[in-house]
């Protein structure tokens, strides 16, 4: 980088549009969409798609709902030519879909292009030429008048060829390539030359496509350019005003949104922003931005993972894990505060109300995503995320104080491993902490069974204590109090919760007991799970008794160590 970039790079001059209207407008309907994945996207690949992959992507674009699809550059590629012929000859184009083909402004290429789409019921022929000063001066050595003559001649030639094939409904699309770097008056003159030569009118619309061939200014400047053209193009009622934003400055989506506010009727782009250099505008992001504002995009991304898989298989370009809406991590929260907010948001969300879950701009379920990956746990996570995973995946709803206790257990694990742990890992850690007997581990007290007397006030426990099988009896005003009495420990039960986990034949009772033990600071939790609620309650009491006794023993060991020191 140089010390003074202004000596090398000139800022783009703002557009003189003092009465601009677009900033106060909102987008209330979806634009017409044109997918250029099979042309602009394909020509930007390390290895362009073969016929099989092109067909796979074409079918996916149709399934998504695109009504206009640019299928290739048939005059530049035999593969593209053959692909277009296959679509037409095998009648693979749905009745509500129109294909588009592209050609440069040369007679031989135009003729080859028209030949490629011969017999199609509908076809858009996309004719373009560069108009910006640098291209006129450096590349072509042409004056403005010569450029206008080139446009008039080649649009006229295309009209001559297509008029001879009345069985096809022909539409002209004209693009002043490098529009965003061209003087507005020159762009307007170029477009009017094409419009007038073609003869736009009722039943004979012309698509005027205005590209940011290379994005060279902020998105608001592009919007000013579009609004200026929108005001000056005639006959506007017979013109479809289209935009083709690129992403060289990283603002392709913003440029497209501003352009729609400024008067654009149609947007060209690619799935996931594929395309030359930094790519075309990403239609997935643009469409779902509309969706999250309550405007249906008329494209179906209800299985976003399937769309991503097809795109990746056809282009060999992976979707970035942070890609808006589609990436593997975009609905994932590792941060403890984020997880807590999401958990509370899900709990408060009205299924029939407006979506208001913090940190999630869209319901992942609308895109076919599960909630499994929304909360993921690493050393930065907190109790909210851990509680969310246990509740969603296992039906375990922990009291708030228990969330604090168990999150410390998980934190120690993630700090030690320095890795993320998933829902299965958390469940295993939960079982290891609170349900150790079910994992085959040995505790000071192990439960084997119980018998209640007829009144429910007395209990006989079948236990192993320090490995010795024995039977203990106790009395109380219920199974929990009777179990505490039978154990003979100075333990006080502070709270008890029960709920069902699972459903049908898999349903089990989950009991959670909070208790305190004399000589141990604070309280602790125990858990029991069984098809029988009384059994689950007894197991929970024994679980917390074991955990509190471990803490008591650890405290005693620490005291001895201090005395010896």
Region locations from a protein language model:
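A mid-to-C-terminal "edge-of-domain" accessory segment
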Residues: 1-39, 294-473, 505-510
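Alpha/beta enzyme core
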Residues: 4-9, 33, 46-68, 84-90, ...
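Short beta-alpha connecting loops at secondary-structure transitions
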Residues: 135, 210-212, 240, 268-276, ...
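N-terminal capping/small domains of soluble enzymes
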Residues: 1-107, 369, 374-377, 381, ...
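Mixed-charge, glycine-accented linear interaction segment located at domain edges/termini
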Residues: 521-562
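Catalytic alpha/beta core domains of metabolic enzymes, predominantly
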Residues: 214-350
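Short, small-residue-enriched loops and turns at beta-alpha junctions
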Residues: 40, 44-45, 74-78, 132-134, ...
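Generic long, charged, amphipathic alpha-helical segments
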Residues: 490-519
């Amino acid at each position: 980088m140089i010390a003074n970039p202004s000596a090398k790079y000139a800022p783009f001059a703002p557009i003189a549009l003092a009465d601009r209207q677009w900033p106060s407008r909102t987008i209330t309907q979806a634009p017409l969409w044109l997918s250029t994945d099979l042309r602009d996207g394909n020509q930007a690949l390390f290895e362009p798609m073969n016929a099989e992959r092109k067909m796979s992507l074409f079918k996916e674009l149709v399934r998504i709902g695109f009504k206009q699809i640019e299928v290739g550059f048939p005059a530049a590629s035999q593969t593209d030519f053959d692909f277009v012929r296959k679509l037409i000859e095998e009648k693979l184009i749905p009745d509500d879909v129109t294909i588009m083909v592209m050609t440069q402004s040369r007679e031989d290429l135009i003729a080859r292009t028209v030949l490629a789409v011969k017999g199609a019921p509908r076809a858009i022929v996309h004719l373009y030429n560069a108009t910006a000063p640098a291209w006129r001066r450096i590349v072509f050595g042409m004056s403005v008048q010569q450029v206008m003559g080139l446009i008039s001649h080649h649009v006229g030639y295309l009209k001559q060829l297509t008029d001879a094939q009345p069985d096809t409904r022909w539409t002209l699309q004209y693009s002043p390539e490098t529009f965003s770097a061209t003087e507005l008056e020159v762009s307007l003159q170029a477009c009017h030359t094409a419009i007038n030569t073609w003869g736009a009118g009722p039943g004979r619309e012309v698509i005027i496509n205005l590209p940011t061939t290379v994005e060279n200014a902020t998105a608001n400047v592009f919007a000013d350019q579009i609004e200026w053209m929108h005001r000056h193009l005639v006959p506007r009622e017979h013109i479809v005003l289209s935009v083709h934003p690129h992403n060289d400055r990283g603002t392709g989506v913003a440029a497209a949104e501003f352009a729609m506010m400024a008067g654009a009727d149609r947007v060209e782009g690619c799935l996931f922003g594929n395309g030359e250099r930094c790519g075309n505008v990403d239609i997935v992001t643009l469409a779902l931005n509309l969706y999250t504002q309550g405007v249906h995009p008329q494209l179906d991304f209800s299985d976003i993972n399937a769309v991503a898989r097809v795109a990746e298989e056809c282009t060999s370009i992976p979707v970035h894990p942070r890609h808006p809406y589609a990436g593997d991590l975009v609905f994932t929260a590792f941060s403890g505060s984020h997880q807590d907010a999401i958990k509370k948001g899900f709990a408060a969300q009205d299924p029939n109300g407006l979506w208001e879950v913090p940190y999630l701009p869209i319901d992942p379920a609308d895109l076919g995503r599960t909630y499994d990956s929304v909360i993921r746990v690493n050393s930065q996570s907190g109790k909210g995320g851990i509680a969310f995973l246990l509740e969603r995946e296992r039906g375990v709803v922990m009291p708030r104080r228990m969330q604090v206790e168990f999150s410390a257990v998980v934190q120690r694990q993630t700090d030690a491993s320095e890795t993320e742990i998933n829902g299965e890992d958390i469940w295993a850690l939960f079982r290891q902490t609170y349900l150790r007997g079910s994992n085959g581990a040995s505790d000071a007290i192990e439960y084997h069974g119980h018998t209640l007397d007829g009144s429910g006030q007395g209990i006989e426990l079948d236990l192993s204590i320090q490995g010795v099988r024995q039977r203990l009896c106790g009395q109380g005003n219920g199974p929990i109090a009777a179990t505490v009495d039978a154990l003979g420990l100075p333990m006080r039960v502070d709270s008890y919760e029960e709920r069902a986990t699972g459903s049908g034949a898999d349903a089990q009772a989950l009991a959670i007991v909070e208790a305190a033990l004399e000589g141990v600071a604070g309280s602790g939790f125990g858990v029991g799970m069984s098809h029988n609620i009384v059994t689950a309650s007894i197991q929970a009491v024994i679980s917390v008794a074991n955990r509190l006794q471990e803490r008591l023993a650890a405290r005693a060991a620490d005291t001895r160590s201090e005395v010896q020191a």
